[in-house]
């Protein structure tokens, strides 16, 4: 058993979670875990710095918030961790990921002779076709509305030439059938579907059926949640589904491939990855729809089939699923990197019997992070202009400076550094007899650029002895000056760490 998606229902004070068990969807509920830690010398728990902390556990979110406010003046730990991630860690850590049901889909829309194609935010044109590939049943299904000039009899003759192709007179019936078909899907995925297909479908269902019918795209009777994002410098709107997860396969492809493509159009990516292409046609898609409906159906089906073929080869949905369950995060959280990394750190700290500090809240400002120097170009025509683009800069620097890990054949033993850090962290008594608390691990390193042994070698100190542990198990003792000569002046091709 393992999870698909989850939400925190604050009003009902519960976590609603969906599982996929033996091919069946199972809906569960969990009680949220309201607890955090604060610094306390008498505490039974340890933070990542080795200091003692105490736990506070409450029964409700209201009590939790009150306790957090009471202890606000102290260093707090884990008061800001999402209750969903706490639930996933407690109940699903180490569990296998489920075999998800995925529905790949693609829509085609009508064309208005005066207004043109409609944007997803104002879908005044009807949806003319929806193709869906259900991976759990390996079925490619096409739903379509024939052109106005074509009779249903003629449309059905064309539909009979394809498997699982159904004609509709009313768009409302087609949309309702689509919702029925994807009802058992855990994931909806399309190409550029975050920007187009999902917002168009949600807004069109609202217009043709009702806003209440959009709940059928989600679980737990939830409405799709509006989300704004920026693309090409403009703000756009999409929808986040609940329980049934939407993942844009184009964004997955951009995230998990490491080469920059000249075009991220489905046609270009399919040709590059599969040697396959979309159905070619002459003229506009509107002309194809009205003049060659059979090829239009083939075109719609092929787009969705290409998506299924891409995932069969690349398995990016499986990758996202494994990453989510390895780190006890939700599938949507894998589209970023911060939430996954943070939860992985939390999980590892808990494995070691430690708790992590709350994130430091920084005030938002206009200060940008330091980056590369960017020269402002001088306008005009220039002669002899050159440009150098260094590919794989960091790996190239590592090779050029002989810094690769395989060159490390020994390690300098940090004896003096370890003692220095321990002494800094230890409690101590001053001349007045009062005891003072030592610093934490991070504070012990304040003012140090590197280990004491590293500094001694770089400064070529003659009177400092340093022990080296070699990869073959031997150990030798040298002065810091001798090691400097061995590393930098002996023309050796190896490195000491």
Which sequence ranges carry the predicted segments?
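Common nucleic-acid-contacting/processivity interface regions adjacent to the catalytic cores
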Residues: 286-429
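Conserved DEDDh/DEDDy metal-dependent 3′-5′ exonuclease domain
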Residues: 143-260
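Short helix/loop capping segments that flank catalytic or ligand/cofactor-binding pockets
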Residues: 112-115, 141-142, 198-199, 255-257, ...
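Non-catalytic nucleic-acid-binding interfaces of large nucleic-acid enzymes and RNP effectors
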Residues: 1-80, 183, 207-240, 275, ...
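Catalytic nucleotidyl-transfer cores of nucleotide-processing enzymes
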Residues: 229-242, 362-497
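Conserved RNase H-like, two-metal-ion catalytic cores of nucleic-acid enzymes
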Residues: 4-45, 85, 89-187
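Acidic, Mg2+-coordinating catalytic module of metal-dependent nucleases/exonucleases
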Residues: 183-197, 201, 242-245, 249-341
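Short secondary-structure boundary/capping segments
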Residues: 119-121, 199-212, 324-326, 400-407
